[in-house]
A protein has these predicted regions:
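Long, low-complexity, charged/polar intrinsically disordered regions in eukaryotic proteins
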Residues: 1-10
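Charged low-complexity intrinsically disordered patches
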Residues: 85-144
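Winged helix-turn-helix DNA-binding recognition segment
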Residues: 11-85
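Basic side chains
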Residues: 4-5, 34, 81, 90-92
């Protein structure tokens, strides 16, 4: 992890960001400082406790779209690539490759959840008005 991080005024000087409570804004900056080179934070709850915030502040950031939380406890700063540009010789891959695989980058360089990370059933099960053929395998129904 680097010792220097950047924050874009295109993100932190917007009305949406400035409407957040000051503690929530401070949490965003601290998460950005502790993120790895792909924007992932391994221990967000530790940061929340360290700076005197609450999980409510973290939930506000998530509801506002500034972070995405994963079931593993890791989170990613959605505007990471808007805020930070790294030279390729200094870049270190994140160790959270499973979580990174669930994301895609939007045209505006923001992380968003990709569609393949949200489909839990095959497409054929998604369409409720069509049924697959039913075949009976009972011994008496087999023709000889």
């Amino acid at each position: 992890m680097a010792n220097k991080r950047m924050f874009s005024v295109d993100v932190v000087e917007t009305d949406a960001f400035l409407d957040l409570p000051p503690k929530t804004q401070a949490l965003y900056f601290h998460l950005g400082m502790r993120a790895d080179d792909d924007g992932f934070v391994s221990s967000p709850r530790t940061i929340v406790r360290t700076i005197g915030c609450t999980t409510g502040d973290l939930k506000q950031l998530e509801a506002a779209g500034y972070v995405i939380s994963f079931s593993s406890g890791v989170l990613v700063v959605t505007d990471w690539k808007v805020n930070n540009t790294l030279k390729s010789d200094r870049y270190r891959k994140t160790m959270f490759q499973n979580e990174l695989a669930l994301l895609k980058e939007s045209a505006s360089k923001r992380y968003i959840l990709s569609d393949n990370g949200t489909i839990s059933e095959p497409i054929r099960n998604q369409n409720g008005n069509q049924q697959e053929p039913q075949y009976s395998v009972v011994k008496d129904s087999v023709e000889k």
